[in-house]
A protein has these predicted regions:
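Generic secretory/membrane-interface signal
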Residues: 5-6, 20, 24, 182
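Histidine-/acidic-rich catalytic cores in large beta-rich domains
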Residues: 34-306
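Sec/Tat signal peptide C-region and signal peptidase I cleavage site
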Residues: 27-33
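Initiator methionine at the very start of the polypeptide chain
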Residues: 1, 33-34
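N-terminal secretory signal peptides that target proteins for export/translocation
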Residues: 1-10
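Bacterial N-terminal signal peptides
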Residues: 12-26
Length: 306
């Protein structure tokens, strides 16, 4: 069971637990996060401080879990969390932090390493897991049986660099951010490439929007781009285009219901916010910065609602 703390307990304890001999502990400050704009609750995870936490709209920590590495998260409709504590697993925990399901990565057919950098609980109850090193997407049931497997086109598989985020599309395909290849690629369920866009940098994320365009977090490309099905850039934010903000390694991106864009700005240093909300007109209307609890390696952040 994970250690999950209330705000009172959080201020008194050292966060961490022992998980398969590799869980790391760290003392976490009770200093307040800095938010600009309308305050909101945020799930954020940083592998420098070894911490995943929900920070409330009052900037107080609601709960926390110790981690080693993390590149993805999903808040499920029943209040559970699908996350990871290392690149070798996917873990589901309930709202109290109790582990209810776990998937551990194995080895490739040749005995090589496999890392996990993306996962999703699907509407049919299966769990999608992208296996880097094995160069495939698998869908597994609660018993961890592979129900479906999709091969990915990766010339030289690399456990750490094959993929970053993978997201399902409305038509049942998968949109894959291939970090090493610098390509966002859509695969059908047989593994056939049906669309791709050459980003030209170590991209982290690609999300298919309701309008059919694709929103891409370009990683070390230091920008966010929205491209059409015809591969035309329709909207973008460049590295130094936002007033008072420099974009660094762009990880998670999403289009919010209000039409604004969610941007996670990793490795940007304490002079810059770690998370931003930006209007179509490129105005920053909300930001989050916390270099006390978190560090300069915060790739994962999503809005949080109970």
């Amino acid at each position: 069971m994970f250690k999950v703390f209330s705000q009172v307990a959080f201020q008194k304890v050292c966060v961490g637990a022992i998980l398969s001999g590799s869980f790391l502990a760290g003392l976490v400050s009770d200093a307040r996060a800095q938010q600009t704009g309308e305050a909101r609750s945020v799930f954020a995870a940083d592998y420098q401080k070894k911490l995943a936490a929900v920070v409330g709209s009052n900037n107080e920590v609601q709960w926390t879990i110790g981690i080693r590495d993390i590149h993805d998260v999903q808040h499920l409709s029943d209040g559970h969390w699908l996350l990871q504590t290392s690149f070798g697993n996917v873990v589901e925990v309930d709202a109290e932090g109790k582990e209810v399901w776990r998937y551990e990565a194995g080895k490739t057919e040749r005995g090589g390493p496999i890392e996990i950098h993306a996962f999703r609980r699907l509407e049919n109850g299966l769990t999608m897991i992208a296996e880097s090193g094995a160069a495939r997407i698998i869908e597994v049931d609660r018993d961890k049986k592979i129900v479906h497997s999709i091969p990915l086109s990766v010339p030289n598989p690399d456990a750490h660099r094959d993929t970053r985020l993978v997201r399902p599309t409305p038509n049942g395909n998968y949109l894959v951010a291939h970090e090493a290849l610098g390509v966002a690629r859509e695969y059908d369920r047989t593994g056939k490439t049906v669309w791709e866009y050459n980003v030209g940098s170590k991209l982290y994320s690609a999300v298919r929007l309701k309008n059919g365009n694709t929103l891409i977090g370009t990683g070390d490309g230091h920008r966010v781009i929205e491209v059409s099905p015809e591969k035309e850039i329709l909207w973008q934010i460049q590295e130094k285009e936002l007033a008072g903000v420099q974009l660094a390694w762009i990880t998670m991106v999403d289009r919010l219901e209000n039409g604004n864009t969610w941007i996670v700005n990793c490795h940007a240093g304490p002079e810059n916010p770690q998370v931003l909300e930006v209007t179509p007109g490129k105005k920053v209307v909300w930001s989050f910065k916390d270099f006390d609890r978190f560090g300069n390696a915060l790739p994962v952040a999503i809005p949080y609602q109970r």
